[in-house]
Amino acid sequence: IMKLDLYTERLHLRPLTEDDLDLALEMFTDERVMRYGGGASTPAEIKAQMPLVTRRSDGGCIGVWCVIDRTTQEKIGSAALTPMPIEENDTNWDLLLNDCIPLAEIEIGYFYKTSVWGKGIATEAASRLLQFAFEDSPLDVVVACFEPENHASKNVLKKIGLRYESTRFAYGEIDAVYAITKQQWLDQQESG
């Protein structure tokens, strides 16, 4: 069985469930959190999305995790490995069906409460998720895309080893796309 509970020094990542609506409402109604994530949503929209965003595929490897502070047990954010949309404005959750690997490129993504910004949390969680992707899942490549002015996200991706690949269409707009292969990741682990 795939072990989907992931731990770091400060964090516990576990699969997002519908019981995490409280976290979703706090983050996704916040314009600051959603500045580069398509803008804030209404509580009704978020509630309607919960059954979709809690889907997983490929035996659980692909999906969204809830990020929890191990000291306080507070839910502080979400991190995900999900199919990257090209034409659509949002993830196509219909691609997440448990027994298959989505054919789309798999991207790493994350959202955090503003209260934990600037503490290295996003980097710590993303680094662990990348390790999971290449050690425990069948993925050979992980990509990420972001609006070019989202410097904080770019810095996280560079810290965990992703490199600029191209500027191209994703989420229905022109985004910068970063990528890392399993071999590149393994080489980085060896070089420390």
Give the residues covered by each predicted segment.
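Short, charged/polar low-complexity linear motifs in solvent-exposed/disordered segments
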Residues: 41-43, 52-54, 93-96, 177
